[in-house]
Amino acid sequence: MRFMFLNHSYVRHSAGLERHILELLKSYAAPDTTFELAYPEDLGGGEVLSLLEERKALSGLHHILETPALVKKTIEAERRGFDAVIQSNTFDPGVEASRLAVRIPVIGLLRASLHFAATICDHVGLIVPLETHMPHTMRLVRTYGMDRFVSGIRTVGLYDTGDLSGYHDVVVQRTLAVGKELVAQGAEAIIPLGGKIYPYVVTPQELEPELGVPVINTKAVGVSYAELMARNNIKHSIKAYPCPTGLDPEAVSQRSKHAH
């Protein structure tokens, strides 16, 4: 099986981080599964992303503006013969729109992780990097019909655009603090969001012993869902995601020929 692991942004990771990501993905996957890390073009959302990152005010606006570029890249993935696209970002940017454009599976880590968690507990707590992530995240949860399942959401108040490896200890400390609050309020499992932090800097295995509940690895869930769908030739419901055939990737970003 061959999967595209699609970054939400056109900004490339360092070579070292790319190697680390591929090693992690392969550790979650079957021996015959391969991955290609891919990046969308910047079709206009890049400047907004830079501004929101600079102000540490990631609200979801950048994900909305990234959607056309992500749809375009997903169409390219289908044309190139990939078995599925896994969106690397844990807030599912472009996933719903992309499912309307292709028939290969497009996996959103948040939605997949919520439903996976629902098979092992009755109430889950969410952890996000910044306070500004909270409204957008809960909006997504409500859209997915999972709001009654989420018992609470907390933030670690931490985000950086560069290498986060130096933040390991403070991330663990803050995650355990808010995780314990969520468990005290009734969470029976925890989903930490913000893939650049979890599991790239801190792994769920580091958190579970202290929290005493399952900590969901969103990347591992995404890989397993993609394998399940590809191996069994399962596709998104055509009733839920009506999809025209033969969409040209360039049609997503070109100006209308009828524009004046």
Protein language model features and the residues they cover:
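Periplasmic-binding protein-like
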Residues: 79-89, 186-195
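C-terminal alpha-helical cap/extension of soluble enzyme domains
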Residues: 6-12, 27-32, 36-55, 60, ...
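Glycine-rich, highly charged phosphate/nucleotide-binding loops
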Residues: 56-76, 170-177
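Short, glycine-/small-residue-rich phosphate/pyrophosphate-handling segment
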Residues: 118-155, 165, 170, 227-260
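Gly/Ser/Thr-rich loops at beta-strand to alpha-helix junctions
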Residues: 9-12, 87-94, 129-133, 193-199
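N-terminal glycine-rich anion-binding loop in soluble enzyme alpha/beta folds
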Residues: 1-64, 129-167
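Active-site rim beta-loop-alpha module in soluble metabolic enzymes
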Residues: 141-195, 201-202
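Short, acidic/small-residue loops that bind anionic groups at enzyme active sites
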Residues: 97-120, 205-225
